Amino acid sequence: MEERPADIEDSEVRRALKAWRIDPVAWEYAPVGFGDYHWTATDTRERRWFVTVADLADKSWYGDGPEAAFSGLRDAMDTAVALRGTEPDGLDFVVAPVPTAEGETVRALGAGHAVSVFPLVSGTPGHFGDTLTPHDSGLVLDLLARLHRTAAPASARVLPPDFATRPQLESALREMSRPWDGIGPYAEPARQLLAVHADALRGRLDEFDRRVRELRASDAPLVVTHGEPHPGNLLRAGERRLLLDWDTVGLAVPERDLWLVADGADGAEGADGASGADGADVLVRYEEATGRKPDPSALALYRLRWALNDVAEFLTWLRAPHGPTPDARQARDALTSTVESLAAAA
């Protein structure tokens, strides 16, 4: 997040690092990403760390409430550590958290947050929305092929295709008759945007349901998936490509990962829920590596799921009290572009 958390002091996070036996001598907030809060730290032995504090209220895919969110986040971080240590060589592209002295991959920070610590890896980070070159697309597909062939750790959860934020989206669609005044500067514009495109959004929800039924009827095998292997979670270190942010790891069909690579490749359609090219030419490399041909309907399902979930999350953000902050403006702009893209493809 660009903004620091309003309810957490830096001193609280620094104290939490004692569980990792880290004594920071250099400490700086890192205004990156969207959803979690990050700091960089250097300890007395000149080791560098990337410290992440998760807002458990924003981890709805793990279940309702902070306890379910913490349990799900812990399972995801445990899974990342297990993947990194997979025998015989491990998945060296997994940037996994560092366990505490007691073996914990994540620790509670107050009632509604959790902290994890990662090694600060040298490299060039990407950004969400970047276009992958054919070379990068190939390298990422190679990583995903390795990941999808890896045996699932015991901590890996099955992740159904449904999206947990759907009730918030449906609630917003039902509650458009009155102005959303007195909440924040972007609430009422969000309502007006939704009112214009409500029929199209309901149609896309119907399409989503149809594609979920098709996927379940196919009985496709589940594999370990990252969940968000987009350029923003990619670190370039020479010819190596590393994957960050494993909080969405879980068991699903491969297309949960593959659509993002296909859409992010040079010349492919955007990852905004619009129908169009499925990047079949890009995915040939994956098919050759795994022997499994990606299913176009499943690719379309997960593309649509991403967009609908984004709409729900941004609406939830803007229907809560907010000010004209950079993060709120980012949510407003992303909501507008995503809703318009969904409607255009309806």
Provide a role label for each language-model segment.
Residues 1-27:
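Juxta-kinase regulatory segment immediately upstream of eukaryotic protein kinase catalytic domains
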Residues 224, 235-298, 323-327:
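Active-site Asp-x-Gly
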Residues 55-57, 115-129, 152, 177-188, ...:
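A glycine-centered beta->alpha junction motif in the catalytic cores
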Residues 34-45, 50-51, 97, 206-258:
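Active-site acidic catalytic loop and adjacent metal/ATP-binding pocket
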Residues 53-113, 128-129, 134-139, 277:
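A conserved alpha-helical element in kinase catalytic cores
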Residues 268-275, 312-346:
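ATP/Mg2+ or Mg2+-diphosphate-binding catalytic cores
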